[in-house]
Amino acid sequence: MLLLLLGIIVLHVAVLVLLFVATIVSQWIVGNGHATDLWQNCSTTSGNVQHCLSSSANEWLQSVQATMILSIIFSVLSLFLFFCQLFTLTKGGRFYITGIFQILAGLCVMSAASIYTVRHPEWHLDSAYSYGFAYILAWVAFPLALLSGVVYVILRKRE
C-alpha cells in the first residue's frame, strides 16, 4: 500500500511539474530565432540579444492563459485534498473529490492546448515554425492528469 501511495504522489507531482513548466517556459512556438509562449513573444538578434514583447491581448490567448492557470490550481488543490482525505477519510472510502479535481485539471490543460492549436492555423503551413517543448509538455500532462484522476476515483483507503 505504501508503494501505491508513493507512486500516486510521484505521478501527481510529475503532472504538477509538467503543468508549471508548460505554463511558464517561452517555448510554445519556436522557429527563425523566435519563441512564443502564453505570456510573451521573444526574438533573438544576430548578437544573441533577446528582445521580448508582451503577447497580444486576444480573447483566445487569454482563455488559454486562464485555463492553464486553472489546471495548475485544480491540480494543487487536488494534491492538498488527497493529503487531507488520506488522514480524515474512513476505511473503505474513495477519493472522489481528489479525483474530480485532478480530472478537471486534465480537462483544462486539454482545452488550453486545443484552443492554442486551433487558433494558429497559419503556423501549420509555414515550415519555419514548429511547436516547442512546452506545448508538447502540456499535451503530455493531459493524459497523465486524467490517469491520475481516474486512479484517485478508483482508489480505496485501507488501514
UniProtKB/Swiss-Prot annotation:
Extracellular topological domain: 32-64, 120-133
Major location category of this protein: membrane
PTM (free text): Ubiquitinated by the DCX(DCAF13) E3 ubiquitin ligase complex, leading to its degradation.
Regions that span the bilayer: 2-31, 65-91, 96-119, 134-156
UniProt GO BP: apoptotic process; bleb assembly; myelin assembly; regulation of cell cycle
Topology in the lipid bilayer: Multi-pass membrane protein
GO cellular component, one term: plasma membrane
Keywords per UniProt: Cell cycle, Cell membrane, Glycoprotein, Growth arrest, Membrane, Transmembrane, Transmembrane helix, Ubl conjugation
Cytoplasmic side: 1, 92-95, 157-159
InterPro entries hit by this protein: PMP-22/EMP/MP20-like (IPR050579), PMP22 (IPR003936), PMP22/EMP/MP20/Claudin (IPR004031), PMP22_EMP_MP20 (IPR004032)
Glycosylation sites per record: N41
Gene3D superfamilies documented for this protein: 1.20.140.150
Cell compartments where the protein resides: Cell membrane
Protein function: Might be involved in growth regulation, and in myelinization in the peripheral nervous system.
Protein family: Belongs to the PMP-22/EMP/MP20 family.
Protein name: Peripheral myelin protein 22
Gene: PMP22
